[in-house]
Design a protein with these regions (language model features):
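Low-complexity, Pro/Ser/Thr- and charge-rich linker/hinge segments at domain boundaries
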Residues: 130-134, 225-247, 281-319
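Extended acidic/polar, glycine-enriched regions
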Residues: 253-296
Length: 641
């Protein structure tokens, strides 16, 4: 009875203790559930789809025609293709190894004679495409391929740059190339990267002989990708840079979990250098020197790429050049991507900046002819800016920022106040016609404000800063919800946004603009990776520019493409704003890699189409047109200012 009375007396205390224990157990169970979900990152393959536990991403294209009509069961994950002069049996085996998925593909010659195989590929239809920015940020991946032999890998990252990502590493055999399938103007155009396939080396199998390719799929968090490769017995290849001047010594590290093998190579000649070790490699480029290469390109433009016929309505314009025809491209077939305006304004911007740093009377005279052509032939009196003298194509917003940038730089070169006003007038025309929400490439924030201030155009300077802030406010508000323009989502919409926001922050010191840029950085960084190649290291994914600006008009990955340097500009300004010098080093890698678009005789290529084959046709080539690639050198000058 005393116990009962005692219990009753302490009932409130006991109840309180039990409630506290319950709450602690509930908290513990929640923490345990969270921890288990964080650990449960196993990779699996079911119903023609790869899944990562706890992640909703469909990492692969649907191969039943429901996502894209042209992506059918032929392209299912793991299906192989090849050309052979005999019968080959391919056996596929999958199993779980802890959290990883291990796949083995065995090619067996069961015939009585030897069989030669070539053009071997295994379809890996990663879900890398651009329906719209919102879908991209939640349900699509950027696929970074490195066909590096025994050290080959794939890093597939959420396009928003956050969360759990998918990795693939070769553990037996070799991947030496990749193909892209189902590209075309009627198959997604610029918004569909294609069906990717990983390619093995050509081989000959004797009777009874087999070849095994094995890879391991695993999850990672992005910044631990290399660590996860090493943890699983793989090799990471790394150099401090991938473009070297002749006479320099390259240092390449081949890193595994046990040790690092360092190989040094004296770069004695220009051109490509392959540094190999035990089936893995790095691709380096030798050049005369960075500045010498730029000097040669500048001279080639002056000597070969300006229209100097006074009878031609394009007199003074800088134009495309056909390296195969060894001639100025007059564009008689009317392709808008070859017009003398548009992206070709980059030649004028480059020469103006170069002439500021290296005064040259001949160059300045050429630039004054070009400025006259733009103002009198490309533009209308109200600064409406066309793409060509014909003025028949659409009114393109991108043109305005480029032309304004050119005019502002012309003022800084010559001191002629009219050029500063022309730059201002061009941007006012842009805002009148396209509003504040247009995502231009190269809003000339720093050059424009500097030119107007030096010219004493205070009202115009203040108005332009107001305009820039109004645009930046929209960018901050939109965040990753980018509108569709010429491509539904792309590197050259997010990179210019970061670059622009950083420059507006530098002009105003208002933190909201830097914070806006910071929020975009994970998605921007997810567009490029660190493959050990001068063409791919810190180069953003682009896969349509060989079609739109090239002679062969081939869709497919372009590594490098000069607009990847917009990311270098963004990183450069972000490093200045934050003090994080790692972004400056990455910016330098990007602009160095783009020097591969320029040759020692001063010629250039608009695009290097990187896959081995596209739609079964041989690719991996430098396009014959020198078109719009000279922007890369303007960015080089910016990053190395």
């Amino acid at each position: 009875m005393g116990i009962i009375l005692n219990f009753a007396a302490n009932k409130k205390i006991i109840t309180t203790l039990l409630l506290k224990m319950h709450n602690k157990l509930l908290l513990l169970s929640c923490l345990l559930a969270y921890t288990l979900s964080a650990w449960a990152q196993s990779v699996s393959y079911q119903n023609n789809q790869i899944h990562i536990a706890g992640d909703d991403m469909d990492w692969l294209l649907k191969t039943d025609g429901s996502q894209y009509a042209w992506v059918t069961e032929r392209y299912q994950w793991g299906k192989s293709y090849y050309d052979a002069n005999g019968e080959i049996t391919v056996e596929t085996e999958r199993h779980q190894d802890g959290e990883d998925l291990v796949e083995t593909y065995t090619f067996i010659n069961k015939t009585k004679r030897k069989v030669s195989l070539k053009n071997i590929g295994i379809y890996t239809p990663f879900n890398d495409n651009y329906p719209d920015a919102k879908t991209c940020m939640t349900s699509r991946c950027n696929v970074h391929l490195w066909p590096g032999g025994k050290a080959a890998y794939v890093n597939a990252m959420h396009m928003n740059g956050t969360g759990t990502h998918l990795g693939l590493m070769v553990t037996e055999g070799e991947i030496t190339d990749y193909d892209v399938w189902e590209r075309g103007s009627k198959k997604g155009m610029s918004n569909f990267r294609g069906v990717m396939a990983l390619c093995m080396p050509d081989m000959t199998l004797k009777s009874g002989q087999s070849y095994r390719l094995q890879w391991r799929l695993f999850s990672h968090k992005g910044n631990d990708f290399n660590e996860q490769i090493l943890k699983r017995g793989g090799t990471i290849v790394r150099s401090n840079k991938y473009v070297y001047e002749t006479g320099e010594t390259a240092i390449v590290d081949f890193i595994n979990s046990k040790n690092t093998k360092t190989i040094t190579k004296k770069i004695a000649t220009t051109g490509e250098h392959r540094v190999e070790y035990k089936g893995s490699y790095a691709l380096l480029l030798g050049i005369s020197s960075e500045r010498t290469l730029i000097d040669k390109r500048i001279r080639f433009i002056l000597d070969h790429q300006q229209m100097n016929d006074p009878q031609d309505p394009r007199y003074g314009a800088f134009m495309c050049y056909d390296n195969e025809g060894d001639s100025l491209l007059t564009n008689t077939f009317g392709r808008s991507d070859l017009d003398e305006g548009r992206e070709r304004v980059g030649m004028g911007v480059l020469l103006t900046e170069y002439c500021r740093q290296h005064p040259d009377d001949k160059m300045q005279q050429a630039l004054e002819r070009y400025a006259k052509y733009i103002r009198e032939k490309l533009q209308q009196p109200d600064y409406r800016t066309n793409s060509s003298v014909s003025r028949k194509v659409k009114n393109r917003g991108y043109n305005y920022a480029w032309v304004a940038d050119f005019f502002f730089r012309m003022y800084l070169l010559t001191g002629n106040k009219q050029y500063a006003y022309d730059g201002y007038g061009t941007l006012q025309s842009l805002y009148r016609q396209f509003g504040y929400g247009f995502y231009c490439i190269d809003y000339p924030v720093s050059t424009g404000l500097k030119a107007l201030e030096q010219a004493g155009l205070t009202f115009e300077r203040d108005q332009l800063l107001y305009d820039f802030k109004a645009t930046a406010d929209i960018y901050v508000k939109n965040g990753l919800n980018f509108p569709k323009f010429e491509v539904n989502y792309e590197q050259s919409i997010i990179a210019p946004a970061v670059w622009f926001l950083c420059e507006v922050y530098q002009a105003t010191n208002e933190k909201r603009y830097l914070n806006g840029a910071r929020k975009l950085m994970p998605a921007l960084e997810a567009l490029q990776w660190q493959q050990p190649s001068y063409r791919m290291n810190e180069i953003g994914i682009r896969h349509w520019d060989g079609y739109w600006f090239g002679k062969r008009q081939t869709y497919g990955d372009v590594f490098p493409h000069y607009w990847s340097c917009i990311t270098a500009a963004a990183f450069h300004r972000y490093a200045q704003c934050t003090g994080d010098s790692s972004y400056q080093e990455r910016a330098k890698q990007t602009v160095r890699g783009n020097l591969s678009l320029f040759f020692e005789d001063g010629r250039a290529t608009c695009a290097f189409v990187n896959p081995r084959r596209v739609n079964g046709e041989d690719a991996h080539y430098a396009d014959a047109y020198a078109n719009d690639q000279d922007w890369a050198l303007t960015f080089w000058l910016l990053v190395n200012e």
